[in-house]
């Protein structure tokens, strides 16, 4: 670099303005720290480079938790959605997950506007090429233009930009997503800091012209009439609007044949790809290879926004050559006359092994260097946002001299996500799912505010408005449950006739209205005719009351399990600097414990290679040290 010059210092520099970077920067700025968020292109702020939706199974929980902590994703998507659906409604409330289609352009514009209008926050177009560290402390960052920004903390939220390599068959080129510039020099800077990098891969399907498809042969997938907001600040508000349709169709046997005939032209199967792809979002080539007995696969057709004719074709991501893609897409039902607007591609990128991080997402050895999002080996906008807000909070806590802000597995899905990454690591892009969470019934998406907002308010991130709304919600639920306990329903002929009409058994003796609601065939709403004193509650509160009542026993059991879990989580291991000094541990346990540096006995117990007998050895060692 020919000429370097110094710029004004910042408390925090966030590198990357995707979903992790936006939440991180907003958190540090709102906590009073002078923050810069830098992006290779301001046109890619809060970009949705793959699917045009927010939420989904497990992911919706993350968005609600980010919102409960005072984050922005939920508020922005509530303003910019074009379709809303609650998934898994036939199952229990633990796995209900909100999923909405976003208007990509409006989402970008809205989030960019929030960043531009946030106090203490500067949005800067620049490529960060170097991080300077002195005595294991962050000193500055340098941009490609030669500007040196002194800073006390850096949060890396680089997405898929680090040495990004786009692949379409034999055609490969260096690039970030959507034709954006990739970043090579920052990868070299990280390696110079002793941080090992590895390669992961993801992909995206083609975008096709809306008017070139035959929707009459597809199944319409409309949005829900009753729109539930993502942000708790919008609970009780009507945010409904005219919604766009999505569509379901299928690949055919001809699709399968074309892919099989051209597999050797896919970089995945030609040995060009070094990165590991996502297990739970496979390319169409992967599906054909992994499920050879299936002659058809689901394809979802989703609009990208109100101001564009581009349609996102979920389920058909591919790295095949462009001409093969076009031939293959035409064999999908309803795609006979399809016109491509953007071709499908795979992208390979650098990321770290997240076991080098603390649960605050700070590097184990370099103070105030934080990582969030896909650079940690995760996939998905929601996973990125969850990590971003935690990294931002903890960067602020460090610089303000306050205690770390850690969510554990019993606190939040965000806690599960981060614990999995930093404790177990991941060999493939990590996707959040409800099945990863041990305490699903207590960590529902509808109670994220009751779980997290008070803690976020204590550190100054959740606003007074958000906190007071949560307190009112809690008070209303508690009072209604107590009221229902006090109302007796007696076995009169009129009562039993009403019960028969509702498909419920007659009463022999009097019971409380609360116990009546516990019957599987009855709901809170259906019991209104037995409750002359009932006042009208908003739907979101009625559902909360019903969930508390129907699952009371299960929730109590899970709370007991959480109590036991907390005992191990609260046994801190910071007294042990080198596990070689602990006699009786297996060699593998010593290596893993020294590498990962678990913060608690609970975290140590979840490390692969650390056995129950190793945990007992640690327990005995800790007890003897206390004496």
From Swiss-Prot:
Subcellular location: Cytoplasm
SUPFAM superfamilies in the cross-refs: FAD/NAD(P)-binding domain
Main location class: cytoplasm
Binding-site list for NAD(+): 277-291
One cellular component term from this protein's GO annotations in UniProt: cytosol
UniProt keyword annotation of Glycoprotein present: no
Record InterPro entries: FAD/NAD-bd_sf, GIDA_C_N, MnmG, MnmG-rel, MnmG-rel_CS, MnmG_C, MnmG_C_subdom, MnmG_C_subdom_sf
Family per similarity comment: Belongs to the MnmG family.
Keyword Cytoplasm on entry: yes
Self-association state and partner proteins as the record states: Homodimer. Heterotetramer of two MnmE and two MnmG subunits.
GO molecular function: flavin adenine dinucleotide binding
Function (record text): NAD-binding protein involved in the addition of a carboxymethylaminomethyl (cmnm) group at the wobble position (U34) of certain tRNAs, forming tRNA-cmnm(5)s(2)U34.
Entry superkingdom: Bacteria
GO biological process, one term: tRNA wobble uridine modification
Source species of the chain: Finegoldia magna (strain ATCC 29328 / DSM 20472 / WAL 2508)
Keywords, ordered alphabetically: Cytoplasm, FAD, Flavoprotein, NAD, tRNA processing
Binding-site residues for FAD, renumbered to this chain: 16-21, 128, 183, 374
Cofactor(s) required for function per UniProt: FAD
Name of this protein: tRNA uridine 5-carboxymethylaminomethyl modification enzyme MnmG
SMART domains: GIDA_assoc_3
């Amino acid at each position: 670099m020919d000429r370097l010059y110094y710029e004004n210092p910042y408390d925090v520099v966030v590198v990357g303005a995707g979903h992790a970077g936006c939440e991180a920067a907003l958190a540090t700025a709102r906590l009073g720290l002078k923050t810069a968020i830098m992006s290779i292109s301001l046109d890619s702020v809060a970009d949705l480079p793959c699917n045009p939706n927010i939420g989904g199974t497990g992911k919706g929980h993350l968005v609600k938790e980010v919102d409960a902590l005072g984050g922005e994703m939920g508020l922005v998507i509530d303003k910019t959605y074009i379709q809303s659906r609650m998934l898994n409604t036939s199952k229990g409330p633990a796995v209900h997950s909100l999923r909405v289609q976003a208007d990509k352009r409006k989402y970008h514009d809205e989030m960019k506007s929030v960043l531009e209008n946030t106090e203490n926050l500067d949005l800067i177009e620049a490529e960060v090429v170097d991080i300077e560290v002195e005595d294991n402390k962050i000193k500055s960052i340098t941009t490609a233009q030669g500007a040196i920004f002194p800073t006390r903390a850096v949060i890396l939220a680089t997405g898929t930009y680090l040495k990004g390599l786009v692949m379409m068959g034999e055609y490969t080129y260096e690039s970030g997503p959507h034709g954006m510039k990739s970043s090579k020099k920052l990868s070299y800077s990280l390696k110079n800091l002793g941080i090992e990098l590895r390669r992961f891969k993801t992909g995206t399907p083609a975008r096709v012209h809306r008017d070139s498809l035959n929707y009459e042969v597809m199944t319409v997938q409309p949005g829900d009439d009753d729109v539930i907001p993502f942000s708790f600040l919008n609970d009780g508000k009507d945010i409904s609007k005219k919604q766009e349709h999505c569509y379901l169709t299928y690949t055919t046997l001809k699709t399968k044949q074309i892919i099989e005939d051209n597999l050797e032209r896919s970089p995945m199967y030609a040995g060009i790809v070094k990165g590991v792809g996502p297990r739970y979002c496979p390319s169409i080539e992967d599906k054909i290879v992994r499920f050879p007995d299936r002659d058809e696969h689901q394809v979802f057709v989703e609009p990208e926004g109100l101001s564009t004719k581009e349609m996102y074709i979920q389920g058909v991501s591919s790295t095949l050559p462009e001409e093969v893609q076009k031939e293959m897409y035409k064999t999908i039902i309803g795609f006979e006359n399809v016109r491509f607007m953007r071709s499908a591609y795979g992208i390979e990128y650098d990321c770290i092994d997240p076991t080098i991080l603390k649960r605050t997402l700070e590097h184990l050895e370099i103070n105030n260097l934080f990582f969030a999002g896909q650079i940690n080996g995760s996939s998905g906008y929601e996973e990125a946002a969850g990590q971003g807000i935690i990294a931002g909070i903890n960067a602020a806590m460090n610089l303000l001299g306050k205690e770390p802000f850690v969510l554990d597995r019993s606190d939040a899905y965000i806690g599960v996500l981060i614990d999995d990454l930093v404790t177990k690591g991941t060999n493939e892009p990590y996707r959040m799912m409800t099945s990863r969470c041990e305490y699903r019934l207590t960590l529902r998406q509808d109670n994220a505010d009751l779980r997290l907002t008070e803690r976020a308010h204590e550190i100054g991130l959740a606003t007074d408005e958000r906190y007071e709304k949560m307190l009112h919600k809690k008070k209303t639920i508690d009072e209604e449950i107590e009221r229902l306990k006090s109302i007796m329903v007696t076995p009169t002929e009129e009562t039993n006739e009403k019960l028969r009409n509702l498909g419920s058994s007659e009463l022999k003796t009097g019971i409380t209205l609360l116990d009546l609601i516990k019957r599987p065939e009855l709901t809170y709403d259906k019991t209104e005719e037995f409750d002359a004193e009932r006042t009208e509650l908003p739907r979101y509160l009625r559902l909360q009351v019903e969930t508390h009542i129907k699952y009371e026993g299960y929730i109590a059991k899970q709370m007991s399990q959480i109590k036991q879990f907390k005992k191990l989580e609260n046994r801190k291991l910071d007294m042990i600097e080198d596990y070689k000094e602990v006699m009786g541990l297996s060699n593998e346990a010593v290596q893993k414990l020294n590498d990962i540096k678990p913060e608690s006995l609970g975290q140590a117990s979840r490390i692969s290679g650390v056995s129950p007998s190793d945990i007992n050895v640690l327990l005995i060692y800790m007890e003897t040290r206390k004496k």
